[in-house]
Amino acid sequence: VTVQSTPATVGAWHWFAPTEVHWRPRDYWQPGTKVTVTANLRGLDAGNDVWGLGDFGYAFTIGEKHVSTIDTVSHQMTVTANDQVVHTYPISAGRAKNPTISGVLVVRYRQYDVLMDSQSIGIPRSSPDGYYEHVYWDTAVSTSGYFVHSAPWSMWAQGSSNVSHGCVNLSPARAQEFYEFSQIGDIVQVTGSSLAADASDGEGDWQIPFGQFANAGAGASTPAGTARPGGGL
């Protein structure tokens, strides 16, 4: 497997599991970088009489630089594009018993309508804290159910207190604006929370210091042109 980019970008591989390897750059991608990922798997002996059937490739171009910072203590979210502040939002993050995860997260996907069910996080629907409802303008920032989303029911708390079950609450208009602004892979940095993002739960690429990331399994960092894996509401 190779990662190539123009301009050349220093990065490294990291094995998160025997069947899962990630490549990340040392620093955030530069806007406009052209990236090609190639997996030469045809004829590869994977063991136990399993063989690669074909080669695969994917090319993409890095978009505009978007970095958002969510401060769960000041209850404010600052959104930047190309290092310029474009939006400042009052937010409500996770309450004390359901904190929002902190760390350097990324936008995973966007979905207009998500049916959120409190049973998925161990809260019965019949509980005073239970819920089962459609939630709109959902921007996912983790693989474990954390979103930035519309929350008209908590507008009274946005900018002053944390009352959510872990997600970041915005007004409907602001949630829509952030949803439409966001690109897959955008950086979303959360600070002030007591719960750190789990490096093994899909949020690990930017949680792990680069030196440690590069030295786990796959070896030292390399230019992109030569990088290869080696060894709630």
Predicted feature residues:
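Exported/periplasmic cell-wall-interacting domains
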Residues: 64, 102, 114, 118-233
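Conserved hydrophobic/aromatic pocket- or pore-lining residues that grip, position, or stack substrates
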Residues: 77, 107, 139
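Low-complexity, Pro/Ser/Thr- and charge-rich linker/hinge segments at domain boundaries
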Residues: 57-81, 99-103
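Acidic, low-complexity Ser/Thr/Gly/Pro-rich repeat segments typical of extracellular/periplasmic
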Residues: 1-64
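Solvent-exposed coil/turn segments that connect beta secondary-structure elements
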Residues: 6, 18, 26-28, 34, ...
